[in-house]
From Swiss-Prot:
The KARI N-terminal Rossmann domain, residue ranges: 2-182
The organism of origin for this protein: Sulfolobus acidocaldarius (strain ATCC 33909 / DSM 639 / JCM 8929 / NBRC 15157 / NCIMB 11770)
Name of the protein described by the UniProt record: Ketol-acid reductoisomerase (NADP(+))
Enzyme Commission designation: 1.1.1.86
Any Pfam family the entry gives: KARI_N
Annotated positions binding NADP(+): Y25, G26, S27, Q28, S53, D83, M84, I85, Q86, G134
Top EC class, one word: oxidoreductase
Function recorded in the entry: Involved in the biosynthesis of branched-chain amino acids (BCAA). Catalyzes an alkyl-migration followed by a ketol-acid reduction of (S)-2-acetolactate (S2AL) to yield (R)-2,3-dihydroxy-isovalerate. In the isomerase reaction, S2AL is rearranged via a Mg-dependent methyl migration to produce 3-hydroxy-3-methyl-2-ketobutyrate (HMKB). In the reductase reaction, this 2-ketoacid undergoes a metal-dependent reduction by NADPH to yield (R)-2,3-dihydroxy-isovalerate.
Positions of Mg(2+) 2 binding: D191, E227, E231
Cofactor: Mg(2+)
Domain KARI C-terminal knotted: 183-328
Length: 332
């Protein structure tokens, strides 16, 4: 079983006197910087240019610095930038200023695991991967809670990399919930797999095919949207709160019987075999290699895919129904 760390297992002392630079001020960057500061950690925000993120950081009470200046004046460098720009920022803005004893910290293992970034041997390299988007990381922390996270060490020059990883996790609120120790390899491969086969790829494609099947059979698109796409949230919320057994207990016997019999017909063993192929591509590095190449050519697959989704019947129907769906939502 995995080792789970909570507040009582972790001390902030190991990073209390360290200077931390958060590179990036997007969803995760803002949440981490605010939470770290509220935990008493000395934080600076490093940004590439004076844009919207710069203004947001100033509005939040920070004095943003250019990336290289933030790096030069810090002991712990936290990469909270998009995966595909981290390597360039590292080579141009971070690597020239690295000194022995500094730390490189990541929220996802992609660049380290696939060796897009190869740190020198005299620095610590570790990861804290919150299991929620940045706004939730901040919201839960501000309300006295926290979201779970994974931690891992890749390079332990100081002998204290795990202690520091756990301390950073505590400072952003993760140990209030629970922190699981993993490896860069495990986090990267399982994260990519989940995104591809169900969370982003599989579930969206399943919902789209279900919607299209009903519409092609002559059912009203609006009704099809409610039954195959909109109600997914209700089911996922039940699974999130109560697990599969709790969800099944909550739905009707008719839904249980239909789901248990037809579900296995639609999602059969052949799907699992294709999932294994997707995992093989992740583990071998083929997916990463293909994605890096695609990004370098302008990421046209994403642009074309987004255009196709935006112009699809299901998306157009969803946009038209959003006012109805949200109108009845109680005011918080």
């Amino acid at each position: 079983m995995a080792k789970i760390y909570t507040d009582k297992d972790v001390s902030l002392d190991v990073i209390k006197e360290k200077r931390v630079a958060v590179l990036g001020y997007g969803s995760q960057g803002r949440a981490w910087a605010l939470n770290l500061r509220d935990s008493g950690i000395k934080v600076s925000v490093g940004l590439e240019r004076e844009g919207n993120s710069w203004k947001q950081a100033e509005n939040d009470g920070f004095k943003p610095l250019r990336t290289e200046e933030a790096v030069r004046n810090s002991d712990i460098i936290i990469f909270l930038l998009p995966d595909m720009i981290q390597r360039t920022v590292y080579l141009e803005r971070v690597k020239p200023y690295l000194k022995e004893g500094m730390d490189l910290v990541f929220a996802h293992g992609f660049n380290i695991h696939y060796r897009l970034i190869e740190p020198p041997s005299n620095v610590d390299v570790y990861m804290i991967a919150p299991k929620a988007p940045g706004p939730i990381v901040r919201e839960y922390f501000a309300k006295g809670g926290g979201v779970p996270a994974l931690v891992a060490t890749y390079q332990d020059h100081s002998g204290k990399a795990l202690q520091k990883a756990l301390a950073v996790a505590k400072a952003i609120g993760a140990t209030r919930a629970g922190v699981i120790e993993t490896t860069f390899k495990e986090e990267t491969e399982t994260d990519l797999f989940g995104e591809q086969v169900d969370l982003v790829g599989g579930v969206m494609q399943l919902m789209r095919y279900a919607f299209q099947t009903l519409v092609e059979a002559g059912y009203q698109p609006e009704v099809a949207y409610f039954e195959t796409i909109n109600e997914m949230k209700l089911i996922v919320d039940l699974v999130y709160e109560k697990g599969f057994s709790g969800m099944l207990t909550a739905v009707s016997d008719t839904a249980k019987y239909g789901g248990m019999t037809v579900g296995k017909m639609v999602i059969d063993e052949s799907v699992k075999e294709r999932m294994k192929k997707a995992l093989d591509n992740i583990r071998s590095g083929k997916f990463a290699e293909k994605w890096v190449e695609e990004y370098g050519k302008g990421a046209n697959t994403i642009k074309e895919g987004m255009k196709e989704v935006d112009n699809s019947t299901e998306e157009k129907v969803g946009r038209s129904l959003r006012d109805i769906i949200l109108r009845g939502k109680p005011k918080s």
